[in-house]
């Protein structure tokens, strides 16, 4: 192989191997086009639709680009092998460099889903010419131009319209809109009390249907207490829970967030590291199945997982359950590789070890028998009213025997005793008080699910997804929302900031429509599969941008953007004036000097600061050490004046 290490590449055995560091070449920004686009933002510049798209070399990686250019154009190099990630972005990363370097040498494509030596050797013997992947590139290039057109035009259009800087994104804005809507549902929820009449039959309890009026519930309880209930129906049905599908990236990110609290980006990073370490297959996949040619490999790997992950349970894998060629377009589901047999798994970092365990467990579960149980529903009549109880008895644990604490499932219903129709019980009746449950704020788990389902409300689980973004880009979308200050993390929850709410409030529905963006994603998939010319898609995007600029190309003075969302977080404990968020933190509008910037170098979130002004403690972690912060108002012993401070485990931070 190419084992002679040089600066920026390796060489040997007739090969030169080098690499890209992300996107070495990308689309130029509007300011680089001239056309007046580099002037102060105005409606007259819009819409910005380049006649010829221009590319630029990324400054931070220019040296690596120049190296690749020189290597490609060396006289002794007769053929190029593209070995970037086998997906849209990988195709674009290579072709942008190849085209910018004006290289015209023949190219073959190395398409691999595993970095094991055996997989690479097999792929090397099955390479196709670059032209076989033109549709993949067309989809990636169309996606990049669509993002540019929506983002660059939308940001300038609505920033000028409302007189403040707004960042618009083709996927980012609809995702933010979903978070804002969920937060509004949570904040606007009014819990409602309801009741059930519960009949204690000794070994089990029968309950009435929901009763909204407490007096009616009390009357039913009084009528039934000490009375006899007669079992009118005993329904038993053997049911099965099918084994779960294998992981695609999104389901892996969701379950890792649920089990370990990992962000989508953390899970992608851990899985990418495992992939580069030859321990799992390609991570950025949207398939939950394997292809026919993977059957024998999957069987061998499943047996390895049984051995190396200490399940110790007899298991005959049914590999055919996870084989479906029609569900694998680019890459198959994520599974471990045979590399786990020789690797020192104990030396893996905790995050990677946890992710590998999830992936191995999923392969075991997916090839295991169904979980079977006997579902029972009892119905009883007391004083003319129907009461019910449900339970289940496990008949065969099946795949669930392999579930560990990483899959924090809800406990199954308890088994009910053997009861016959016509049997009677003397009961003690009580009034059960309940409350309706509020909608929950998004976590990365539930947001990823919502992004995946967006635009798919009328489709079943096995229909090809549209969704917001792709498995490869959803993590970056969430991170961008957080980085730009539109969303903040509050524990596992993702909450919209005032800045995020403001943006969603002012932009029109067509810009924040999840359905429209999902339809665009569906069209990109059609381009990738050769079912739609990319020119048709781009024409539609250009018409959308032109119409949007025409419709909203005027100043709207009815809306005034705040500077960072200046909604008061509380009253100043020193002078009583409003405390608001500014560019450098929170400050008192009464100018008494009270401010909150950072506590021990850590910037608190909007939610944490609001909590402090409500008298609540909050906590943060810095350099691995957790610190509790609580507000205090104390008297200065030297002048008798009251002042505000933070009381923490590591000392005081005066405000």
Where are each of the predicted segments found?
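Intrinsically disordered, low-complexity regulatory segments
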Residues: 1-144, 148, 317, 410, ...
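Basic, low-complexity terminal or inter-domain segments flanking catalytic cores
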Residues: 6, 72, 155, 188, ...
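Amphipathic alpha-helical transducer elements in NTP-driven molecular machines
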Residues: 14-17, 21, 58-69, 74, ...
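Short, polar/flexible loop-turn hinges at active-site or ligand-entry regions and domain interfaces
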Residues: 53-56, 84, 104-108, 129-136, ...
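C-terminal or mid-to-C-terminal helical accessory/interaction module adjacent to the motor/catalytic core
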Residues: 66, 75, 117-201, 236-240
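Metal- or metallocofactor-binding catalytic centers and their adjacent structured scaffolds
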Residues: 214-247, 253, 438, 515
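Conserved short loop/turn motifs at secondary-structure junctions
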Residues: 83-86, 163-165, 236-245, 254-260, ...
